[in-house]
Amino acid sequence: ILAGKSASTAHPMWTDDKLKDGQTVSFELGGCRKRYNVGLARTVHLGNKKPAKLIETAKVVEEGMTAVKATLFANAKAGDVHKAWQNVLDKFGLEKKSRIGYSIGVGYPPDWGEHTISFRPKEQTVVPENAVVHIILGMWMDGWGMELSETLHVRKHDCMALSKFSWDIPLLS
């Protein structure tokens, strides 16, 4: 759970801080069935009105996820998929220095990653058909953050999300 002062970083430490009105909260969730793993991240806002910066950033991230999905298919290079994301960020003057995803699927403790594909600039790894990847478009800004992630099954000409959860950022009051 990314909230409060921990909302601007990935994988924060646990705290006893209480959630407060006006906070944007991201949840990173994982599921596992017979050692097949999936990840999912979504964001909510506590209160009656989303901040303009959250609305604007969410639109960019959604456009970026759409661009990533359009370029992720069998035999695509991981760096080209990352470039589709970066092109969207460049249009809006935003920056994300960390990778945007990795292979996932069959995993064994202590970690669910397969350590074979990493979506980062200039990565030359070819994404094979039937790979399963976790694309994480987290934007950790100064004092706040938001996340959208999907676990995607790579097919011959496209990819398919393994979840059907909305990308919308709901208000919780």
Give residue ranges: language-model regions.
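Active-site neighborhoods and metal-handling regions in enzymes and metal-associated proteins
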Residues: 1-173
